[in-house]
């Protein structure tokens, strides 16, 4: 699945599986992929709904992550395979741990 975004009158088509995380900063959205960072303005609600279908989860109220790029999680940060790290809220930490830890 591809996500279509518009930036400076140029349309970009991003493969959803290439997206590591999406941060919502006021009216701006930062989309971090394996190779690039996009800073755009678009409807974050629809974008988040689309990405959740593909296994993305919220790490805070303003950030959604792709678990396939996560190396490890502690109570404060999510650490990605490439060395990036983003803040994690405690409530979301508990939710994500339930998702990634298999039940006995």
Predicted regions and their residues:
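Basic, polyanion-interacting recognition surfaces, primarily
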Residues: 1-104
């Amino acid at each position: 699945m591809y996500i279509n975004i518009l930036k400076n009158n140029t349309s970009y088509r991003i493969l959803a599986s290439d997206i590591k995380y999406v941060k919502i900063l006021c009216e701006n959205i930062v989309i971090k992929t394996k190779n690039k960072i996009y800073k755009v303005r678009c409807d974050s609600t629809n974008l988040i709904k689309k990405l959740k279908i593909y296994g993305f989860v919220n790490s805070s109220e303003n950030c959604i992550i792709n678990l396939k790029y996560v190396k490890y999680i502690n109570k404060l940060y999510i650490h990605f395979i490439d060395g990036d790290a983003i803040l994690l809220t405690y409530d979301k930490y508990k939710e994500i741990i339930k998702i990634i830890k298999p039940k006995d």
